């Protein structure tokens, strides 16, 4: 099965490795967004509204600081290339808070999505791509939050014949 990676998160480094290849292939060049397609709800694929996704000091960052309000504008960043039979290695961290009008569940919430529909296949007002997401959740200071959850927007996962 082929997939596209989308990374709505702050990435410090990111690479994939073919199972048999043994060598890591960087996905992010550390300089710019070449090879990546932004998709933000309510906007066409390829529009990087308010510079949501940016590169600063070699770090890929996601920021909503240019938005007057969140207004349901979920952001996703797609790799232009498709991958299969891969391992993914990355470093990430959360920095800053959320917008006042954003839903509570997006606070310190990010992840990467695989086996996803493409950015151009998403409808204009579609919040999340049909995909499998490996979710990152940070501590909000209210007690432990489970991280590494699997979310399946628009999909079902079958394990041992059960969904």
Feature map (PLM): residue ranges:
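Carbohydrate-interacting regions of secretory-pathway proteins
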Residues: 19-163
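Bacterial N-terminal signal peptides
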Residues: 8-17
């Amino acid at each position: 099965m082929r997939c596209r990676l989308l990374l709505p998160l702050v990435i410090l480094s990111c690479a994939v490795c073919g199972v048999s290849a043994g060598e890591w292939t960087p996905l992010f060049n550390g300089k710019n967004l070449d090879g990546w397609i932004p998709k933000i709800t309510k906007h066409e694929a390829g529009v990087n509204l308010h510079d949501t996704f940016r590169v600063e000091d070699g770090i890929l960052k996601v920021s909503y600081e240019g938005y007057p309000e969140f207004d349901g504008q979920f952001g996703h960043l797609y790799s232009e290339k498709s991958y299969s039979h891969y391992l993914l290695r990355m470093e990430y961290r959360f920095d800053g808070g959320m917008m006042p009008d954003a839903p509570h569940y997006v606070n310190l919430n990010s992840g990467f999505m695989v086996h996803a529909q493409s950015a151009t296949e998403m409808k204009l007002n579609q919040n999340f791509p049909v995909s499998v997401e490996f979710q990152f959740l940070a501590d909000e200071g209210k007690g432990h939050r489970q991280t590494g959850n699997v979310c399946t927007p628009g999909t079902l996962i079958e394990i041992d014949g059960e969904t």
